[in-house]
Each structure stands twice: as structure tokens, then as C-alpha cells.
Amino acid sequence: MGSLGAILKHPDDFYPLLKLKIAARHAEKQIPSEPHWAFCYSMLHKVSRSFGLVIQQLGPQLRDAVCIFYLVLRALDTVEDDTSISTEVKVPIVMAFHCHIYDNDWHFSCGTKEYKVLMDEFHHVSNAFLDLGSSYKEAIEDITMRMGAGMAKFICKEVETIDDYDEYCHYVAGLVGLGLSKLFHASGAEDLATDSLSNSMGLFLQKTNIIRDYLEDINEIPKSRMFWPRQIWSKYVDKLEDLKYEENSAKAVQCLNDMVTDALVHAEDCLKYMSDLRGPAIFRFCAIPQIMAIGTLALCFNNTQVFRGVVKMRRGLTAKVIDQTKTMSDVYGAFFDFSCLLKSKVDNNDPNATKTLSRLEAIQKTCKESGTLSKRFCVFDFPLETIFYRV
């Protein structure tokens, strides 16, 4: 639950936080008895509690498939992220990862904390994967193969251009969107979404994470992880790491705003994808992370704290998003409000101000044209600014 100080400052957070805590305890009690499934669901809650909560609302077969899909890709991502592994060792592993998921004797020790446990005990994930229906297995294998090939390409290549950036994000996140769309379709609950819309769902989340995690990635030991494209950052500094130095704050914020503006191009596709969903559980599963993403972009925009430490939405607001996101009108409301906040933070002297405002106005137009913005809105306070969110 949130800290006492945060709750006293935002007393209306208390009830959503309490509901979230109760839901988390309930989810932990739902862990299956079979050892391999027990490992998978307990690991899911350790690597992503919020994801673990939302996934519990899916139907049993789809829930199992999405759980394993997530853990397989987290394991693959753990190999890619471990900067202590040499390229010569790493590339063959990620290239063959789609084969390893069929081998319940395979494991590879890497990563730290819960991710090391995931890798050391990967046979549990393999056993659970083998329990899935054939259509689910085929979708997971296909996406894992394509993602591994893409990761291998960028292990040996830096992100130079915006096209490189989009391609990298496609491999590590856009393909997740494609895979989830395949799993939703295989379950019989949804029509198969277009690759373009599915890709945008992944890119919006991934670009938000890359922006938010700048400092963590640049300070990675033994080697920095650099995902911001040179085509953007080279307009402001000579080296990507220069953005974290206080003397470069003005240029760093301009670069940050450029990155946020680039991410916003995917928002309208995300709204279209979500508006096409039929199942309430699948809808919430998709919508909650997207609202968190645009909220995080609103918090990061024009904020030097991105280059000084951790920037994230407060836990109470996260609890409200999870509790109150029920329908597409809630999504339109949240996207509209967060785009209003973003718009209020645009400095007309920023070199990308015109482009940023244009993208925000396009998002607002889509939300207004939905015809669902008639409700009033509550105001929530961030440590750094005021955030609006739908009641």
C-alpha cells in the first residue's frame, strides 16, 4: 500500500489502494497447485504485480497462455538486458530461444534477483508452455522467434536513426502486441487486430519505458544501455550520457520533449485498437497499461527529474487507474485529461512545440469525437504537478 504520508496528502487514494491490496492478496491465493503452474504464477506476481492482477481477470485458458507468453518474453529480455554476457554468447541464445521453450531441461543463469530465479528454474515455464493448446503454442513460438532475431540484430547494432528506434521497439514490444492479438483471437474472444494497430500498442508502452528509464539504462554496469536514437539526441548534446549532467539541463529537457513527442504519434492507433475490443476483461487488460503510459509521459514531459532519478506515477493514482478503468469512455477521458496536462506544459520556445501541440490536439480531437467526455473530472496532485483523471 502507499506510504502514510502519501495517503494523508491524497486521502481519496485510500480506498483504491485498499482495494488493490485486497485484490493482490486474493490473486496470490488463486495460484494453482501444480508445481510448474505455481512457479509461473508466483513468478508473474514477483516480476510484475500490476500485470499479475490484471491478468487474473482473463478467462482460464487465455490467462494461462498470456502468463506463459509474458514469462517467456521476460526471460528472453533478461538475456538481452544482461550487459555482463558477451555478444558471442548472447546472440546464439536469443536466436534459439523459441527452441529452448520446448526443452524442459534447458536453463541459463543470468539476470539478478527474481529474474535469476526465473532463468535458473526455466524448466517450470517450459513445462507450463507444453500444457497449452496448439494455437497458443504456435503464436508464442512465432513471436519468440521473431523477437529473438530482432534482438540479435540490435545486440550488434546501435540505435542510430528514428527508423532504427521504431524497428528496435517493434522487435521488443510491437511483436508483443501482435502476439497478444493472436492469443486473443485464438481464444475466440476477439477478432484478429491489424498488425499496424497491434504494433502501435507495443510501441507506445515501450517508448514510454525507454524515456522514463533513461538514467537507469545509461548508468547500467558494466556497460550502458542506449536506446534513445542518435538522430534525436545528437541535436542537443555530443554524447547521450551528457544529458544527465546538470549543466546540460536545458538541452536535456528539449531532447526529452522531442522523445515524448515521438511517442505520442502512436496514441491514436492505441485508442482505435482498444475501441475495437469486445471482451471487458481483455479490454481492461489492454487499457490499464496504456493509460499508465500516457500518464507517465505527462509526468516526464519537460521534467528534469528524468535525468536525476526515478520518475513514476504515485501508487495511489496507479490504484485509481486499475480500479476505475472499466469502459472505453474511461480511456477517452484519461487520454483527454493527460493530453490536456501535457499541453499545459508545452513551452512555446521549445523547438518541437508546434509538433507536440499538433499531436496532442489530434489525440484530443479523437477523444472529443467519441462523444463520451460529458462527465466532470476530479483533480489529483502529483509531487511535481497536478494530474487530471476521470471519475
From Swiss-Prot:
Its EC number is 2.5.1.21. Pathway: Terpene metabolism; lanosterol biosynthesis; lanosterol from farnesyl diphosphate: step 1/3. Gene3D superfamilies: Farnesyl Diphosphate Synthase. Keywords: Endoplasmic reticulum, Isoprene biosynthesis, Magnesium, Multifunctional enzyme, NADP, Transferase. GO terms for biological process: farnesyl diphosphate metabolic process; isoprenoid biosynthetic process; response to jasmonic acid; response to molecule of fungal origin. InterPro entries: Isoprenoid_synthase_dom_sf, Squ/phyt_synthse, Squal_synth-like, Squalene/phytoene_synthase_CS, Trans_IPPS_euk-type, Trans_IPPS_HH. Induction: Induced methyl jasmonate (MeJA) in adventitious roots. Induced by A.niger mycelium-derived elicitor, thus improving ginsenosides production in adventitious roots culture. GO terms for cellular component: endoplasmic reticulum membrane. It holds the Pfam family SQS_PSY. Coiled coil: none annotated. The keyword Magnesium applies. One of its GO terms (molecular function) is squalene synthase [NAD(P)H] activity. Its cofactor is Mg(2+); Mn(2+). It catalyses: 2 (2E,6E)-farnesyl diphosphate + NADH + H(+) = squalene + 2 diphosphate + NAD(+); 2 (2E,6E)-farnesyl diphosphate + NADPH + H(+) = squalene + 2 diphosphate + NADP(+). Its main location: endoplasmic reticulum. It is found in: Endoplasmic reticulum. Component of the triterpene saponins (e.g. ginsenosides or panaxosides) and phytosterols biosynthetic pathways. Catalyzes the biosynthesis of squalene. NCBIfam families: squal_synth. Belongs to the phytoene/squalene synthase family. This is Squalene synthase 8.
